[in-house]
């Protein structure tokens, strides 16, 4: 579930839903149409909470923070056109003073960051052959209507990158930005030494180009 507008800090989000698995229907929470007298106002309904009024990072694994989307990034535009769309991931290498499309050490030395993040697995004809370009696949790598890039991995610049680096402590401490996913925005913004990854490219959309 994703929302088009952010909830206020004191607002709560909860859902009830049903799904089918192996031909059997399962229900989570209660629906107002279930017909039970217990569900009629002013009685309470049982729902699955996705966001509490005190939603915040919790490194001990409690609460709902771990359910937050940690692989979707906004381009700041809508109605993105796939024609001549280009997107790259770069890393600001302070030792050479330039933006690079790869890291120059570890198991992924020289490997384009698009491939590291599984955003380049196909060629222009959708054959399974990386071609150095972003795979523009609606619903899998991009929501063109609302300008959202979808990384097909969780915590791309955190735990995923750490795994690609072989979980080498020296390399993960140098390159990984785990605080981007398990800290507040204010804390993450203060870690300028880790905030070195950028999405660059060009595109045409309703609000930007």
Residue ranges of each PLM-predicted region?
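Surface-exposed, low-hydrophobicity segments enriched in Gly/Pro/acidic/Ser residues
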Residues: 1-209
């Amino acid at each position: 579930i994703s929302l088009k507008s952010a909830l206020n800090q004191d607002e709560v989000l909860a859902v009830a839903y049903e799904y089918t698995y192996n031909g059997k229907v399962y229900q989570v929470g209660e629906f107002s149409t279930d017909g039970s007298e217990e569900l009629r106002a002013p009685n309470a309904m049982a729902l699955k909470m996705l966001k509490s009024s005190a939603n915040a990072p919790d490194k001990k694994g409690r609460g709902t923070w771990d359910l937050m989307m940690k692989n979707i990034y906004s381009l700041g535009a809508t109605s993105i056109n796939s024609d001549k769309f280009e997107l790259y991931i770069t890393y600001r290498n302070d030792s050479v003073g330039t933006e690079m499309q790869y890291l120059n050490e570890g198991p992924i030395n020289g490997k384009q960051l698009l491939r590291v993040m599984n955003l380049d697995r196909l060629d222009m004809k959708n054959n399974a052959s990386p071609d150095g370009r972003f795979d523009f696949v609606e619903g899998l790598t991009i929501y063109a209507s609302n300008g959202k890039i979808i990384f097909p991995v969780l915590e791309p610049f955190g735990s995923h990158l750490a795994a690609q680096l072989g979980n080498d402590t020296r390399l993960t401490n140098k390159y990984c930005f785990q605080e981007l996913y398990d800290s507040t925005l204010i804390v993450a913004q203060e870690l300028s030494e880790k905030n070195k990854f950028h999405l660059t490219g060009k595109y045409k959309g309703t609000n930007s180009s």
